[in-house]
Amino acid sequence: MALVPLAMKGHYFHVYDIKVKSGRGDEFVELFNKFDYGDNNPFHRSAAQVKDGVLCRDTEDPDHFYLIGEWRDIDEHRRIREFVAREIRPEFVKLIEGGHFVPKYAEIVSMTPQEVLDKAAAAE
């Protein structure tokens, strides 16, 4: 199997650290997916999105999640996020403790060069 970097140097991750109301984790996932997979998700229509986000659940706390995605332009992500919060107001946000759905942004500053990954894969 060919190895590929998780993300590209110079791009950005958005990292949401989400704690939902106690006992509401499964409901959160259901409502999140309803919005994320729906026709009303402007994030998926942006050319600035490189890879679609993934929602991860903490293995030790069923009400704790991380949402991570790769973007070329965090200003565009921020603009869309603010529009979604103001105009669309997805139902899943109501389940987040404190009601805040704001990520940290991280610049990707290093990645393994493809030739190194290819060499490792060839050695298998």
Predicted segments with their positions:
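Short beta-strand/turn micro-motifs at beta-sheet edges
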Residues: 1-6, 53-57
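Acidic/histidine-enriched, glycine/proline-rich intrinsically disordered or flexible terminal extensions
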Residues: 6-7, 104-124
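Active-site-flanking beta-strand signature of metal-NTP-handling nucleotidyl enzymes
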Residues: 11-19, 66-68
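Short, surface-exposed ligand-recognition loops at beta-strand->loop->(often short) alpha-helix junctions
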Residues: 19-32
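Short coil/turn motifs at secondary-structure junctions
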Residues: 21-23, 72-74, 110
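An amphipathic, aromatic/His-enriched active-site/gating alpha helix that lines ligand/cofactor pockets
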Residues: 34-51, 60, 70-106, 123-124
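A generic structural signal for beta-strand entry/edge sites
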Residues: 62-64
